[in-house]
Amino acid sequence: MSVTGYDVRLRPAQPATPAADAFMIHHSDIGNGLELAYVREGVGGYPLLLIHGYPETKRIWWRNIEALVAAGFEVIVPDLRGHGDSDLSESDTYDLVTYSRDLYALVHDVLGHEHVGVIGGDVGGVVAVDMVHRFEGFVDALCFFDTVPPMVIDAYVAAGIDIGSIKAIADGPTGDYRRRQGGEPDVLAAELNSPALRRAWVAAMYGPRLWASPGTFSDADIDFMTEPWADEARLRAGWAVYQLGYGRAAEEFPILDRAVDVPTLLFYGADDQVVGPDFLHCCEVAFTNRVGPLVLAGAGHFLQWERADIFNPTVSMFFHSIASKV
């Protein structure tokens, strides 16, 4: 899509990235013998759950945590099972509903929150929508960006949206990763037979695969983001959601077939080449109580990192308005 005339060379400097060890990493058993790793800062504030996607870990939120804590929120930033510092699944169980149940167990059962605000993009956005519907009354409000929109197909057709145009579920010019990670993971894993090659595969998604706005991620940023993916088992865990479209079994289907009625702040990164601008039209239909979609120039798929200067204050204002009512 891009914003015509926007010069990314003039994009403001973004907040400094905290050191890799800037935040304490907690580990909690979520009741099934599996431990999730997470950052928890600002305890006592209104709770916000930040859910990463792929090829991400909790590190994608590093530029957001301090600002949201300073704004008065309790910020909970987990690694999904199999990702980052969280445990791998001994049963190789990785699917969207499992992620949803894991995070509910962490935030509700372990940390004791009866309700929460949720922020998610990519896989994290889909998990967030499932949580809205699956755990009624738990999610007060949502921030949703750059992911697969809810699949309210009849409503989209009625609104004149061409279902075939939804890029997030299509195979675009840089979309071979979907086929390879989903349909031939063993072949791909055999090719990526060293930590360096595995990191290079992920690094391309922060660079030449055009997920991000040009120049957003420095070499140091990419090193930081790819380090957790050097391990083959963790990279394979990240691929699991893509395999759901190629016959991988899931215990349950996520609840994505209905509109979202909770207050929702919507963003879209204008330079995203994974999720297309059809996302805007879909969100205007699927979210009945929305702010946005707000299109961010100079940002792509990882907009919380790429335009933290806009994301942090906007998210803070939105969730302050929610917290004042609950």
Segment roles from a protein language model:
Residues S2-D29, L36-V39, P47, I76, ...:
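Flexible "cap/lid" subdomain of the alpha/beta-hydrolase fold that forms the substrate-access gate
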Residues V39-D85, G121:
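Conserved HGGG/HGGXW glycine-rich cap/lid loop of the alpha/beta-hydrolase fold
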Residues Y54, V148, F302:
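Active-site pre-Tyr helix/loop in NAD(P)-dependent dehydrogenases
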Residues T57-K58, V126, A299:
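A short, glycine- and basic residue-enriched loop/turn
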Residues W61-W62, G276-L280, W305-A308:
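Conserved strand-to-helix beginnings and helix N-cap segments that scaffold or border functional pockets
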Residues A299-N312:
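Catalytic histidine-centered segment of alpha/beta-hydrolase-like enzymes
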Residues F318-V326:
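Short, hydrophobic alpha-helical segments
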